[in-house]
Amino acid sequence: MADLKGRFDDAKDKVEGTAKEAQGKVTDDKGKELEGKAQSTFADVKDKARDAGDDLKEGAEKLTDKVKEGFEDLKDKFSKDK
């Protein structure tokens, strides 16, 4: 649930940043334009970091499953040897 809220917040920041950037361009306010670009870029970075974290978590879960399968195979092998 927290991840969903984080992704929502990132999307909201991206939209707000894009709006500030557009406002800065229309009003020729370079500060507002840069603020918007920064906010939008930071939202993108946070989103990419969440994706990377999700990929790492998924990889760790797959590795854990493979290790468990390996232990089960070893257990079965030693059980049959007796």
Curated annotation (Swiss-Prot):
Signal peptide: none
Pfam families: CsbD (PF05532)
Residue segments, region Disordered: 1-39
Annotated Basic and acidic residues bias: 1-36
InterPro entries reported in the protein's UniProt record: CsbD, YjbJ_sf
Family of the protein in this entry: Belongs to the UPF0337 (CsbD) family.
Protein name: UPF0337 protein EF_1180
Organism: Enterococcus faecalis (strain ATCC 700802 / V583)
Taxonomic lineage from the root: Bacteria, Bacillati, Bacillota, Bacilli, Lactobacillales
